[in-house]
């Protein structure tokens, strides 16, 4: 969709994770190719066919399925062997009694854990948990386990190395920003912990929760919230 990309005979556009692209981005992809495709019967240009896919449709996308000229296909089943993810809201005061034992239980069972933070590092006046601070804290709490971190400011080869180590089971607990939201598949990860969960949208929480429950083992997602609502 960049200006310097030229399509000569593009007939089909497939947009995965459709909700992550803006309206202008999607429209640009269609309009920039419309002049390059010619209908044999009338000689007029046409836009390419469009297939969009998402598990977390935003309100605009849902409206298009109802009021727009779209054919809709629904995959209503989980892949074979998948189990529902147990999702729970937990308060900061309950971490020691409820969450930390769960982390130990999952790792001792041979499984792995994601821990999501909104910020990379602490900011003055902010109470949001950060990747670097949380990593240090968890390394002190769980000295027997391999705890590493991942965030978007790391070099690509550094990020690839961390994900390779996590996927191969060499990391027990991965503290990360939302860079793991899409495109990550580690079936052995069975516990997702999301700090400051009240600051995320439902679509993003759903995507993050979907990083676990990808194997045959039962999985859990804990949403840590300071809000009483």
Predicted segments with their positions:
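Inter-lobe coupling/hinge segments of SF2-like helicase ATPases
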Residues: 1-229
């Amino acid at each position: 969709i960049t200006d310097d990309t030229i399509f000569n005979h593009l007939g089909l556009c497939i947009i995965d994770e459709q909700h992550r692209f803006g309206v202008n981005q999607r429209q640009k992809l269609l309009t920039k190719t419309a002049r390059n495709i010619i209908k044999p019967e009338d000689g007029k240009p046409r836009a390419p066919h469009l297939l969009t896919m998402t598990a977390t449709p935003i309100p605009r996308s849902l409206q298009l399925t109802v009021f727009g000229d779209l054919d809709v296909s629904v995959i209503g089943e989980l892949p074979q062997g998948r189990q529902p993810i147990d999702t729970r809201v937990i308060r900061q005061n309950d971490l020691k009694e409820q969450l930390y034992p769960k982390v130990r239980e999952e790792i001792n069972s041979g499984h792995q854990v994601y821990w999501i933070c909104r910020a990379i590092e602490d900011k003055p006046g902010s109470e949001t948990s950060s990747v670097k601070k949380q990593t240090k804290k968890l390394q002190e709490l769980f000295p027997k386990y391999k705890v590493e971190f991942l965030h978007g400011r790391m070099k690509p080869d550094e990020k690839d190395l961390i994900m390779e180590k996590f996927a191969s089971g060499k990391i027990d607990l991965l503290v990360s920003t939302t860079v793991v939201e899409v495109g990550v598949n580690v079936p052995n990860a069975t516990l997702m912990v999301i700090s400051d969960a009240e600051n995320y949208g439902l679509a993003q929480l759903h995507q993050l929760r979907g990083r676990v429950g990808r194997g045959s083992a039962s999985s859990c997602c804990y949403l840590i919230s300071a809000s009483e609502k």
